C-alpha cells in the first residue's frame, strides 16, 4: 500500500511513523512517500494532508502544483485524511475564530472537498494546546486527542457527512465517503488506531 503525505509543511515524519504502525496493525505493508510535487502523487492508494499553518500549506500546495492532482485523486475516490490544518484545507467553508457564525471569506486555497464549515483556532488563545481523551465512533476505547491551535467543525453542510467525534461545542472528527478529517493531531500519539481506520478505506 502506497500512501503519500503532503510534505510542504507540517508533521510529515510523525505521520510516516504512525502510518507504518497502522499498516502493521491491519496486516499491510505501507510505503510512505513525501509528496512535494505532482509526480509524487502518482499511483498512490491514499493521501494525508498534515497539520501546520493552513494558509501557508494551501499556498505551497498551489505553488508546487499539488491542488489539481489532489482533486483528481479525490474524484477517483482515493482516501484522503486531513489533520488539524488538513481539516481546514479539506473544508468547503472556513470562518475565522474571531467571528464564529458569520460568513467571512477566508483568503486561502481550499480543496473544498468536505461538506463542512470549519472555524479556525476554534478553542481560542487560552486553550491553544491541550490534550484530552475523547470517544471516536468506530474505535472501541477512548483516544488521546492532541489539539494545537486547533480548528473545528461548527456546521455540517450535508447529510453525507458523518460525525465521528465531538468535544465541547464543536465537532472534531468527520468522515464523508473516502474523506476523513480531524481537528486534532493523531500522529502526535503512539496510538495507530485512527490511521488504521483510515487505511482500511483503501
Swiss-Prot record:
In terms of SUPFAM superfamilies, this protein maps to: Class I glutamine amidotransferase-like
Instruction: Give yes or no: UniProt keyword Cell membrane.
Output: no
A GO-annotated cellular component: glutaminase complex
Residues annotated as binding L-glutamine are 52-54, 120, 148-149
Q: In which pathway does it act?
A: Cofactor biosynthesis; pyridoxal 5'-phosphate biosynthesis
Q: Which family does it belong to?
A: Belongs to the glutaminase PdxT/SNO family.
Q: What is this protein called?
A: Pyridoxal 5'-phosphate synthase subunit PdxT
Origin species, per record, is Methanopyrus kandleri (strain AV19 / DSM 6324 / JCM 9639 / NBRC 100938)
Amino acid at each position: 500500500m502506497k500512501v503519500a503525505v503532503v510534505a510542504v509543511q507540517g508533521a510529515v515524519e510523525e505521520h510516516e511513523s504512525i502510518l507504518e504502525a497502522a499498516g502493521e496493525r491491519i496486516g499491510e505493508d505501507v510505503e510512505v512517500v513525501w509528496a512535494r510535487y505532482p509526480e509524487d502523487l502518482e499511483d498512490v492508494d491514499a493521501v494525508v494532508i498534515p497539520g501546520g499553518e493552513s494558509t501557508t500549506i494551501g499556498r505551497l500546495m498551489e505553488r508546487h502544483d499539488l491542488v489539481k492532482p489532489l482533486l483528481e485523486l479525490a474524484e477517483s475516490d482515493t482516501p484522503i485524511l486531513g489533520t488539524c490544518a488538513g481539516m481546514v484545507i479539506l473544508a468547503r467553508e472556513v470562518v475565522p475564530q474571531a467571528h464564529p457564525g458569520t460568513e467571512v471569506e477566508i483568503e486561502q486555497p481550499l480543496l473544498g472537498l468536505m461538506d463542512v464549515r470549519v472555524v479556525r483556532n476554534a478553542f481560542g488563545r487560552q486553550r491553544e494546546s491541550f490534550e484530552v481523551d475523547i470517544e471516536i465512533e468506530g474505535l472501541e476505547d477512548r483516544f488521546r486527542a492532541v489539539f494545537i491551535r486547533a480548528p473545528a467543525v461548527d456546521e455540517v453542510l450535508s447529510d453525507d457527512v458523518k460525525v465521528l467525534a465531538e468535544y465541547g461545542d464543536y465537532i472534531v472528527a468527520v468522515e464523508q465517503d473516502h474523506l476523513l478529517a480531524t481537528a486534532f493531531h493523531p500522529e502526535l500519539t503512539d496510538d495507530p488506531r485512527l490511521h488504521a481506520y483510515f487505511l482500511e478505506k483503501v
